[in-house]
Each structure stands twice: as C-alpha cells, then as structure tokens.
Amino acid sequence: MAVFPWHSRNRNYKAEFASCRLEAVPLEFGDYHPLKPITVTESKTKKVNRKGSTSSTSSSSSSSVVDPLSSVLDGTDPLSMFAATADPAALAAAMDSSRRKRDRDDNSVVGSDFEPWTNKRGEILARYTTTEKLSINLFMGSEKGKAGTATLAMSEKVRTRLEELDDFEEGSQKELLNLTQQDYVNRIEELNQSLKDAWASDQKVKALKIVIQCSKLLSDTSVIQFYPSKFVLITDILDTFGKLVYERIFSMCVDSRSVLPDHFSPENANDTAKETCLNWFFKIASIRELIPRFYVEASILKCNKFLSKTGISECLPRLTCMIRGIGDPLVSVYARAYLCRVGMEVAPHLKETLNKNFFDFLLTFKQIHGDTVQNQLVVQGVELPSYLPLYPPAMDWIFQCISYHAPEALLTEMMERCKKLGNNALLLNSVMSAFRAEFIATRSMDFIGMIKECDESGFPKHLLFRSLGLNLALADPPESDRLQILNEAWKVITKLKNPQDYINCAEVWVEYTCKHFTKREVNTVLADVIKHMTPDRAFEDSYPQLQLIIKKVIAHFHDFSVLFSVEKFLPFLDMFQKESVRVEVCKCIMDAFIKHQQEPTKDPVILNALLHVCKTMHDSVNALTLEDEKRMLSYLINGFIKMVSFGRDFEQQLSFYVESRSMFCNLEPVLVQLIHSVNRLAMETRKVMKGNHSRKTAAFVRACVAYCFITIPSLAGIFTRLNLYLHSGQVALANQCLSQADAFFKAAISLVPEVPKMINIDGKMRPSESFLLEFLCNFFSTLLIVPDHPEHGVLFLVRELLNVIQDYTWEDNSDEKIRIYTCVLHLLSAMSQETYLYHIDKVDSNDSLYGGDSKFLAENNKLCETVMAQILEHLKTLAKDEALKRQSSLGLSFFNSILAHGDLRNNKLNQLSVNLWHLAQRHGCADTRTMVKTLEYIKKQSKQPDMTHLTELALRLPLQTRT
C-alpha cells in the first residue's frame, strides 16, 4: 500500500455538542414523568345487576402512593370483584370460623419463640462426658417365631408375638463391657441403624425389640456423669421409632381416592389404620418393665390421634403417674423431661399435664439429698457438686415447657413453691434459666434474697448470680433497684478465688453494668477483672470470656472518646498476650469504630489508641498470612484512615498520613488508600485557594505530590502503580506542578515495558493486554492537555510512549497494538485543533503554547503518518484466510477513525477511506447491518454545511450484496 498523508479535519466542538444535545420538550402539568410518584386508584365496587351485558356499579376511590409494580392494576382486579359479589353474612361467618380455627391452631402449634430441643442436644453431648468404661446390651436376634403357616388364628399370632417379646427379655442379648465413650456412641448408632434396617425389611417386632432394649439402658446409672448424654442418644432412637410408626399408620389412611389432611380427626382414619395402631399399643402394654414401657409408649404418643380425639389428653396424665414408680430421682426427672418434650410436640395446649409433672417433681425433689442417692454417689466416688449439675438439662426443659406462654399467676405460684423447699439452689437456677427474662428482671431483688438464703453445698451461689445476670442482660430491672442489684451481685463475684468461676460470672455482669451505668462503674468492673485475672497469668485460660467482655463494652459505648477515656480499657487489652486473640480483639474494636463513628475525628485520645490497635493488626501480617485476612485488615485500617480529619489543618493531616505510611507499610491496600487520601488533600487545598495558590500552599501541594511519588514505587501491583502514577500526575497538573506531573507521566511510560503478559486477577491468571489498552486510552486523554516541556522536543511524552508501544512484545494473534495506534491517531488529531476539547484551569496546553504553529502541526502530521503506516502494515499481514475476519473488523474501525477525525477533502485520504471500505467487505466478513448504518450516517452528515464533500464519498462506497 502507498504512503498516505494525514490531514486532520477542523472541529468546532461547541457546535458539535449543541447538535448532539437532546431536544428539550416542555412537560405540561399532569403529563407522565418517570420520577413522578405513581398513584393507584382502589375501587370498592358494589354489583347491582348481572343480567344482560350491562351492569351498573357504584364505587368509591382512594389514591395512595405505591410501588411501580402496582401501577399495572387499573381499576378493580378480578378477585376484588368476586369478593364484592359475595354474601356479606356468609363472608362474616366464614371469617369468624377462620379466625377461631386460627386461634385454635395457634394454641396447638409451638411458635418460633420456643427454643427447640435440637438446640440443646449438642450442648448436652459436649458437656456431659466421661473417661470411665461403659457397658451396653446388644440385641442378638432370635429365630423363634419366624417359621409358621399363613393360616394361624389371630389369637395364635398374638401369642406368638408375645413369645417373641418374652424371648427378648429372657436373654437374646449380649452384654458388652469396658467400652469407651466413643465406642458406646458407635454402638448406639449401630442400634439406630439396625432399627431403620429392620423397619425397612418389614421386621416390625425386631424393631420394637431394639427400642425396648435401648429404653432399658435409661435405667442404668452406673456411670452417672454420662447419663444426660446417654439420654440424648437413646431418645434419638425413640424419636426415630415414633416417627416410623406414625408414618406407617398415616400411610394406611392414604389411597388413590383420598388424602388424609394435616389436621385430621379419628373419623378420617380407616379401620385398618386403627387396628394397626391398637396393635402397637397392645404390644407396648405387654412390656413388663416400667421404664421401657413408659418410654416406648411416650415415643408413639402421637398415634393416639388415629384412635380418639381425647386419646392424647387421656394418655398424658397416665404416663405422668407412671413416672411416680421410678425410684431414682435422676432417671425420674429425665423421664419427665421426655414426656414434656413429646407433649409439647403433639399437644402443647394441654398445660395441665406439664404442670402436674412439675408439681410431682417438687414432691420428690428432697430425694436428691436423701440417703439412697448419697450412698449411690459414695459407691461411684462422685461428689455432690458434680452430681447436681446433671439435673439442669432436664429441669430447664421442664421449666421451659411449663413457662411457655404461661400466665403470670402460674409463674408466681411456681416460684413460691420453689422458695418453700429447702436446698433449692438447683431449682432456683432452673427457674431463672427457663422463665421469661422480664418476669425475672422485675423480681430481681426477690431472687437475690432467695439466692442469699440458699445452702451453698452442692450448687454454688455464683452460678445463681450468673443465671440472674443472663436474664438482666435481656430485660431491665426497676430503675430504683439497679445499683443495689449490681452491688449485691459483685459482692459475691469479687470474692471468688477460682479465676474460671470468677470470669464466667464477671463476663455476664459486665453487660448489665455497661447497659445501666456510666464509664465510672464500667472502669471499676474492668479494674476488678484485671486484678483477678493477672495473677499467675490466669487470663491465658480465659481468652473467650475476656473477648466477650470487650465485645459487650464496645457494643454499648459507641462514643469512642468516652470509651478510650475509661482508664482501665487499654490495660485490659494488654491481657491479650496471644497474638491471634489480640488481633481478633483489635478487629472487633475497629469494626465497631467503622460502624458507629458518624463524624470524622481528630481527637488525640482516639487517634493514639486506634493507631496502636491498627499497628497491632498490621504487625501480625507475615509471609503465611492469607490474602483474605490481609484484605480484612486493610479494610479496617482504611476505614480508620478515612475517618480521620483535621479540618482546615492540612499540614497536620499530611503529617498523619506520613506517620500512617511508616506504620502500615506491609499492607498494599492501605498504601493505596494513603496515596488517594493525599491526592484528595491536595485537591481540597486547591479548592480552598480556588486554584490561586500562595507560596505556602504551593509548597504544601508539592509536598503532597512528593509523598505520592515516593510511595508509589513501593507497591507490588503493576497496574496499581500505573493508575496511581496517572492519577497523581493529573492532581499535580491541576495544582500547576508541571515538572512533577511530567515526572509522574515519565515514570508511567517507563513502567509500561514491565507489564507482564499474564496477571493475577482474583486468583486467576488472565492476559494483561486489555488492561494495558484501557490504561493507555486514559493516559492519552490526559496527554492532550499536558503542555510540552520547553527543554524537550515537540510532543516529547507522546513520542516516548509511542517508542515504548512499538518495542513492547505483543501477543502474536493480538490486534491490541493497532487499537492503541488508532487511539493515538485520535489523540494527535485532537492535538492539531486550534482549541482543545477541554483544559485544566490555569494550565496552558499546547493549543495556547503553539497557537496553531505550522511547525507543530507538521510534526503532528508526521507522527500521524507514522502511526497510519503501522496500522496499514498490520492490515496487510492479516491477508491470510484465518485472519480475514480480523482484517475486516480492523479495516472498518480504521475507516471510522478517518471518517471522524480526518479531512476527507484530501484526495489521498479520501481514496484511503474508499480502499478501507472495500477491504472490510472484500471477503464477505463484514457485518452488513453495521455497514448499512455507517453509510446512512455518512449520508446524514453530508447534509451539514461544511460536510458536503461526504456526498461524493457516499457514492463511492458500495454495499456488498450476498446471494
């Protein structure tokens, strides 16, 4: 291809902008406007006549502002019309019936405010463990009764089933001894799986035998410390069995013609289901031992729904009375807990049975301190303080069930009954754990009096004060009692010698102190904690509780000037000696500061404290720190930096940024934030001075620019550095620091050759060329207004950049280099205009410096011709079959560039554009729709006064037809 000269067309930017502006259309009042609130008319319609095609309606309308999606409803929707035609009396009756049904359902279903058993299960298993050896009886199975004829009479079948059960009770089992706790748990899991397998293979009697065997284990208290966990494991099997039986009977009521509703009555159940249900209850009734008979029947209690409406309400009192026959108080209380659990699942409205369980328990409560239990504890070598904590899981559950939506009078009666019993610390603790926090809080002084009267043997008072503190964290006591409550509690807590007992109580009461008192009281509490936890480095064993204390304090003190004026707060932080814990605490503090600090601050107390906190976080970073952790720490430190403002004292602000740079040099995102902050500071200075810098402010902005220039090279990310060089150069230019701006731009140009072929983006390696193209396009936009340095040649920076682009090693099949050259052509065309498209205030760009000088324009055109030659040479290399589509696309792109920026009155340039048009279509690779729209645009432009020469060009641009 021949060499083509370049001639830029003269642009009148103001006229072009005016021609592109959208036409302003006056909007009359009442017309639609996208930001106008939408109103929907709600029509209440009364139907008068349905005959014929005409019907009259009367409606009243009301308008309201609603969401845009509602605007599609115009008038009355069909459902409203049906509702309007309904008979009012029938409608009222239906609504009343629905309301009664809903109220009934509300009483028969436990709400989400009731804490389920599953929440407590994991805690019990984790807490009640043992290292002693355990034993278990495993069911070995029996072959008796499997052979027989199908013609056996019903009575013989029943006899056979009973014999099978007798066979089980007579010894078809194997006792495994000396099991560890984990072995025991594994065996229980095996039994659970055996139950499911037996059921799936239709061996119902075997399944029942397994459940009976498991239930018997609940009468064994030989390893008493493990009993609560054993109860959880065994009742899981019972729950599985109860669910299998219920679903089996329920499935019998479902056939292809009918489906049993969720709230069915016994009349809905068929005879087969009822007979099967009775059969299960008869089998269970034949179990001789009390404990397995009780547990297995309780597990299928829900099946009574198939037999009678009153079945459950009749069975619950009977089962409650059965528990009276269990002599061991621990076994008895857990049996009551299971019955309450099943009762709450199937009939939560039957409160009488729950209450009866509680009052029966109170009658037998003194057994806990009786001789039988004491002798058992002596045999097992268990002390009373270790024995009594076995009761709370069961007692707390019973109390929770009873107190759920219970009237105030019942709770008061229960509290009074507990008060009358001697040695009632255990009861009192369960009352405070299960009753509503509001109930406890309003009677705080009464409970403190009861706690004082408790005998401390077996159940220490500090645990009672801890339970009271947990309630007071949720509900407020009477204002007049608050200080006295704190004093009474802290008298007991501060006397505790054991650091673990002390911190477990103190952690709870810190929240009460923060909630209701000032920093003076909080400081006193923190000082007491430091006093108790410092000796023998006791704090090392209590980091979780100490962390909770910090979280509670910062949750209630959102004013950080007040928080850091608490004298003992920072010494409290010094107890966190373990680095990982200390960093977590610092993260909590910074997170709270970012969330709750509303206004920027310059308070020296806050700044010094938080700089120390941030420094602690920063210094924890090492070579093994994960990227996610670095991001989190950087986010928190950046949040702090953004909230520091010294107002108009810009020099102090810059000093803070200098100090921060020295403290946080290992976190790149923090350094990036500091550079942005300093650039913003320079621009704020410019804004204050309205662009007219004094000698002092000029020196200050140069200091800001120098800060950025020094900091950027320390960053690792190459595109981060490139973009910050560009951004900082723009800031320097805006503040008339021309030599510093040149230094930034030169640094950016010298960095381009270092851009690697692939870069890491979010953990994935991606080609870098598209990112480089984006950066260079932004750079070109800035270079338009950068004035030439008087000691260097014309367009020195552009020439340097072109040399770098030329020498850069591009991908073999990449066209990014040519796209960049096309952008350079746009830049040079803009530089040749008499007046540039945009300027920086008080900075003379080349249009002012050269004033359209012919030498400058000649140099500019020469560069354009060089760039064009590079583009045309690349197009020539794409004449291969596999690259024809790329050639077509690039050719059309270059054509559009010439059309937009070139002076097509020049014959050679005009001919080049025609050649490019033909090249784009030569091999049928062009997008016809794009070509058509381009030609339409040319014809439209040709109608403008100074663009008539495009008419002739349009005639020379044929459209390729496809046949």
Curated annotation (Swiss-Prot):
So where does this one cross the membrane? 703-719
A Gene Ontology biological process noted in the UniProt record is:
Golgi to plasma membrane transport
Q: Which residues carry this modification: Phosphoserine?
A: 265
Q: Which domain of life is it from?
A: Eukaryota
As for membrane topology, the entry says: Single-pass membrane protein
Q: Where is this region: Disordered?
A: 43-69
Compartments where found: Membrane; Endosome
Q: Main subcellular localization, coarse class?
A: membrane
InterPro entries according to UniProt: VPS35L
Q: Which UniProt keywords apply?
A: Disease variant, Endosome, Membrane, Phosphoprotein, Protein transport, Transmembrane, Transmembrane helix, Transport
- GO CC term (a single one): endosome
Compositionally biased region (Low complexity): 53-69
Spell out the subunit comment: Component of the heterotrimeric retriever complex formed by VPS26C, VPS29 and VPS35L. Interacts with VPS29. Interacts with COMMD1, CCDC93 and CCDC22; associates with the CCC (COMMD/CCDC22/CCDC93) complex which contains at least COMMD1 (and possibly other COMM domain-containing proteins), CCDC22 and CCDC93. Interacts with WASHC1, WASHC2A and WASHC2C. Interacts with SNX17 and SNX31.
Identify the disorder associated with this protein. Answer: Ritscher-Schinzel syndrome 3: A form of Ritscher-Schinzel syndrome, a developmental malformation syndrome characterized by cerebellar brain malformations, congenital heart defects, and craniofacial abnormalities. RTSC3 is an autosomal recessive form. Affected individuals show cranio-cerebello-cardiac anomalies, coloboma, microphthalmia, chondrodysplasia punctata, complicated skeletal malformations, periventricular nodular heterotopia and proteinuria.
Record-stated family? Belongs to the VPS35L family.
**Functional description taken from the UniProt entry:** Acts as a component of the retriever complex. The retriever complex is a heterotrimeric complex related to retromer cargo-selective complex (CSC) and essential for retromer-independent retrieval and recycling of numerous cargos such as integrin alpha-5/beta-1 (ITGA5:ITGB1). The recruitment of the retriever complex to the endosomal membrane involves CCC and WASH complexes. (Microbial infection) The heterotrimeric retriever complex, in collaboration with the CCC complex, mediates the exit of human papillomavirus to the cell surface.
Q: Report the protein name in the record.
A: VPS35 endosomal protein-sorting factor-like
Native species: Homo sapiens
